[in-house]
Each structure stands twice: as structure tokens, then as C-alpha cells.
Amino acid sequence: MTSFIAGQLGFTYGLHEASLEFPQSGLITIAGPNGAGKSTLLGILAGLRSPYRGSCTFAGREVAQWPKREFARRVAFLPQSVRMEFPFTVEEVVLMGRTPYASGWFQTAEDRSAAEEAMTTTDTLAFRGRDFRTLSGGEAQRVILASALTQRPEALLLDEPATHLDLRHQLSLYRLLGELAKSLLVVAVTHDLNLALRFSNRVMVLEDGRIAGDGTPEEVLTAALIARVFGVQATLHGGWMSYEG
């Protein structure tokens, strides 16, 4: 079974004739140099970039033709960063993820149950009453992830989710994404090839808007491909890469 299928997919800038097929579960990372088209591809999958050339379907329907509310119940998107200007609590931010289900001003029992479940999954229950603006980078990222999970999506799309995290929180986040990917599709854009190598079920590498490699981490992240696409020499040591300029 598949969720996203794209054929000859292109955009005004950053993407050219990309064809892909994503399953209903698993952790897929999209890597590549700056300007390779990673965020453009993710934006098309998330329904945020249109019009696009070619075809991109989710669950058999063209992404651009999905009703926004219905699509948001099935596909969750996490941008690189989220800023809150007002003093929302963690729990209030998490409940914002239920917006696609909202039928009025008040939260339902199902909304609260979904938020509780998401905060438990992301280990954010302990600070549910705190002002979101006071959180550390790692805490804030887990809260935003919890908000996305309250949508109870079939696909979770993340644009460089580890960018502002230290190494410990990067590893913790990707372990969690790996667990989530056992039951839903997780697609994450990353610049960190070590995270892609260690945690992905599948890696897609983009170069100049085209797919340069697509397969298991071991198949794709070879020294030859890394040298050609990224312009650096890579050596694998015990499941981790080291680089030379």
C-alpha cells in the first residue's frame, strides 16, 4: 500500500521531474545540499506549494484537489521553527493541532484525549502548564510534534526538525520518529547524513532538483555519492560517518 505517489513532479524553482512512491509507514529522510529542492518537495507533499507540474497524489487523490480541512486531518506538517507571540501554555499549543476537527469554540472529550495521548508520546505532560515561550529548543520541538500528533495523521512531514537541537536532543527526536514510523509515514528533510544513516528506513538524496539516490541508507549513502553530490570525502566507522573537506 502507498500514500504519496508523484510522477514527473516539478515546481517553478527547485524541483525537476521527480518521481517517487512512498509507503504507508516508515521513516524516510530527504537529504541534499542547500537549494537541492528538499523543502520544495516537502512543501508540495504538504499541499503548500502550487501549482506544480506533473502529478502528486495522496491516497489516490491529487494533493491540490484535497479539501484543506480533510487533508489536514490526514497529513501533518512541521516547519523548521514555530514562534508564539502570546502566552499560550504547552497544552494550549498542543490542542491547536485539533483545529482540523474543530466544530465550535469548545474542546471535545476527543480533543482532550488526543492531546493527552500526544503529550504522553512526546514526554511533554510534565510541563503542560508552562508558557510555551519559556521552553528550551528540545522541549519546544517536542511540543510542536505533539501538536501535530493530535491530528492523528497518516503521514507526518517535517522540515529539518533537528536544526535547533543539540546532539542529545537530535538523537532523542529521531528515536521517537523511528517509533512513530512503525505505524505511520514519517518524511523528514535533514542536512545530517549521520541521522539519515542511523535512523532511516529509506533515504532520498536530491541534487539540483533531481533525485540522485533513493533506497536504503546503506545503498544510497555511499562514499561515491557523497563525494559527487556534497563535494566531501566520507568514511564510515561503526555506523557513523566522518568527513574530510
Task: Report residues per predicted region.
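Conserved ABC transporter NBD signature motif
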Residues: F22, G54-A64, F71, R130
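Conserved ABC ATPase signature
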Residues: D131-L135, E139
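Catalytic Walker B motif of ABC-type/P-loop ATPase nucleotide-binding domains
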Residues: L156-E160
